[in-house]
């Protein structure tokens, strides 16, 4: 069997564009957040998303204990916030850089996000270095911004909604 090496896999994955998201939580284990593009729809009955999280990440224990999260899909122009949540910046500095509301699950919702999905984690599957978090959506909040943000070919790109 031919196994693809890690660098070849990563180079190939850079060809797949994906929305840029900040995943947040708040609860008994505290408040935390990270940037992720490994997020996708699973089903609409019941409305469910999946989020992939490295078990070695500093935020993993917080999400694992809180069992709630909010997927905040970023708009064009929010690249600095994505970089902040994707780095080693202390949590209080990450959250201080934007305005937040509290969602129905208690998780922080980014006020200027393109869309926010407030969720409960209902199943976790471990694969390799990551946990796949299956998340039932309890509430959705949309913002009227016309521009989305995607990560493609190792850089950010703005997307504009088509005129109807």
Curated annotation (Swiss-Prot):
PANTHER family given in the database record: FLAVIN REDUCTASE (PTHR30466), FMN REDUCTASE (NADH) RUTF (PTHR30466:SF1)
UniProt-recorded name of the protein: FMN reductase (NADH) RutF
Annotated source species: Escherichia coli O127:H6 (strain E2348/69 / EPEC)
Family label: Belongs to the non-flavoprotein flavin reductase family. RutF subfamily.
Function: Catalyzes the reduction of FMN to FMNH2 which is used to reduce pyrimidine by RutA via the Rut pathway.
Catalytic activity as recorded in UniProt: FMNH2 + NAD(+) = FMN + NADH + 2 H(+)
A molecular function (GO) term: FMN reductase [NAD(P)H] activity
Keywords for this protein: Flavoprotein, FMN, NAD, Oxidoreductase
Pfam families the UniProt entry points to: Flavin_Reduct
Catalytic activity, EC: 1.5.1.42
Induction: Up-regulated by the nitrogen regulatory protein C (NtrC also called GlnG) and repressed by RutR.
Record SMART domains: Flavin_Reduct
Signal peptide: none
Record's keyword annotation contains NAD: yes
GO biological process: nitrogen utilization; uracil catabolic process
Classification of source organism: Bacteria, Pseudomonadati, Pseudomonadota, Gammaproteobacteria, Enterobacterales
Alphabetical list of InterPro entries matching this protein: Flavin_Rdtase-like_dom, NADH-dep_flavin_reductase, RutF, Split_barrel_FMN-bd
NCBIfam families, alphabetized: RutF
Gene3D superfamilies: Electron Transport, Fmn-binding Protein, Chain A
């Amino acid at each position: 069997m031919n196994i693809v090496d890690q660098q070849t896999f990563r180079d190939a994955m850079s060809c797949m564009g994906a929305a840029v998201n900040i995943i947040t939580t708040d609860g008994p284990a505290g408040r935390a957040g990270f940037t992720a593009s490994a997020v996708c729809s699973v089903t609409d009955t019941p409305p469910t998303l999946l989020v992939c999280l490295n078990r070695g990440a500093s935020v993993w224990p917080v999400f694992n204990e809180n069992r709630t999260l909010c997927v905040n899909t970023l708009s064009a122009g929010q690249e600095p916030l994505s970089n902040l949540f994707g780095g080693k910046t202390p949590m209080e500095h990450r959250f201080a850089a934007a305005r937040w509301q509290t969602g129905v699950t208690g998780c922080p919702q980014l006020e200027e996000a393109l869309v926010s999905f407030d969720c409960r984690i209902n199943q976790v599957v471990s694969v390799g270095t990551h946990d796949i978090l299956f998340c039932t959506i309890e509430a959705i909040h949309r913002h009227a911004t016309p521009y989305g943000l995607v990560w493609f070919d190792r850089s950010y790109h703005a997307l504009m909604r088509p005129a109807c």
